[in-house]
């Protein structure tokens, strides 16, 4: 399948605002009154990615990710709409976010996603997904089935390629 460049239905791109004062800055990552209930986080984690390194591409069957890119580096985000019933099926979308463009990004199930640290220093990403990693008590998102993740990064012949 050949992907075409375009916006992807259901993906939320929300600029994050840093409020600066003499002490530093503060940024609200999410608020329940500004995020649809279907995307309300149930856990949160932070990851650090080395310069030039990518995470993904992968997708989820049931989980939506709510990523926050604030810096101190920049990331190129890659999205592919693999949902057959989606009005934007076959679309590919990219953008650079992070220190130069702080962004909250909600990615619904079935949208393949990856990000690559394109800056010169280590980059931090927050994720506040709407499902628990490995399910309740880490017993599997469907008991006995491990993690809700299809890892395309493990397939060298994957159609989801980063540039």
Where are these regions (language model features)?
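Non-catalytic, conserved peripheral segments adjacent to functional cores
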Residues: 1-100, 118-163
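Beta-rich strand-turn-strand
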Residues: 101-106, 111-119
